[in-house]
Regions:
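Secreted/periplasmic carbohydrate-active enzymes, especially glycoside hydrolases
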Residues: 1-175, 183, 213-214, 228-229
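Substrate-binding/catalytic cleft of secreted carbohydrate-active enzymes
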Residues: 155-163, 167-297
Length: 297
């Protein structure tokens, strides 16, 4: 198995509207002989206009060999994804053989934003932002149709959160489906993404399953710019478990600018964000928000 395409920004210059775009992909040679190829990336803006074309180096893989290939380049006049501004680029990645023929290609919708966490604050594109929004059941259903909602209805309901002043949705307990994740990308709504959990920290095989699910969720959703927080559990987890969750993030999403944490984690230094339900409303180190302050259900 391979982990697919990973696209991320680096060397952000918000004022200068510049960012280095990086594209990576795991490639496996399943042929019986060595294969050589080059890795290319093309960037299209929201109107479909080509704004970047990056040529990678030549690679040769032996039979059965797996390697991560990379290409990067500077994007000028960049539009940065932000709250209420879901600007998305299309990145087309391509493997070409030495004779110029196409081996494989992937099209990825993504956006670029700069994040920073620390001193009790969260910065988005060099501006401190106070987190306020909604803790929504991941089913996100509507009366009459339940969870079987069309794409436009996902956009409508998620945009309602933005238009009401919310900049964050904390999905409850389990990872949201791709339609909602992509919808939040479009409407400019920050997401806190859980993997799958119960009401509290667990152990043994149940914890192993949560780790496995977080790995799969990160790989599946790491190109979606609206996901900024990875939630390790509905409530606090142990320091050891927090370190395990961060290790998964560091392995599969080391450059995505996302924080790993959980509610009730303000006393765990290794957590990168925290939150409470009642009474505690500030933090010296961890960015935090009141995660279930108003339980009008």
């Amino acid at each position: 198995k391979t982990t697919g395409i990973y696209i991320y920004g680096s060397n952000y210059d918000i004022a200068g509207k510049k960012v280095t775009v990086n594209a990576e992909s795991q490639v496996r040679n399943e042929d019986s002989k060595s294969r050589s190829f080059r890795f290319f990336a093309k960037i299209l803006d929201a109107d479909g206009k080509e704004v970047g074309h990056f040529d990678g180096e030549r690679y040769t893989l032996k039979p059965g060999e797996t390697k991560t290939v990379k290409v990067s380049g500077l994007l000028n006049n960049a539009h940065f994804w932000s709250w209420g501004y879901g600007y998305l680029y299309t990145v087309k990645t391509l493997l070409k053989a030495d004779d110029g023929s196409k081996i494989d290609d992937v099209v990825t919708k993504t956006g670029f934003r700069k994040t920073q966490f620390g001193e009790g604050k969260f910065y988005l594109n060099d501006r401190a932002i106070m987190m306020h929004g909604y803790a929504q059941r991941t089913s996100n259903e509507w009366p009459g149709v339940g969870m079987s909602v069309p794409t436009w209805l996902s956009d409508y309901s998620n945009k309602l959160m933005v238009e009401s002043g919310g900049n964050l949705v904390r999905w409850m307990h389990v990872c949201p489906w791709k339609q909602d994740i992509e919808s939040c990308d479009r409407v400019g709504l920050i997401q806190a993404m859980p993997a799958g959990d119960a009401e509290k920290d667990v152990f043994d095989r149940r914890w192993e399953q949560r780790l496995e699910l977080m790995k799969e969720a990160i790989i599946y959703n790491r190109n979606n710019p609206s996901i900024i927080f990875y939630e390790s559990g509905n409530r606090g987890v142990s320091r050891e478990h927090m370190l395990q969750m961060k290790a998964i993030r560091d392995e599969f999403d080391p450059h995505g600018g996302r924080a790993s944490g959980s509610r009730e984690m303000l006393n765990i230094n290794e957590a990168e964000y925290g939150g409470e339900m009642l009474y505690i409303n500030k933090s010296k180190k961890h960015p935090m928000w009141s995660m279930e302050y108003h339980r009008d259900e």
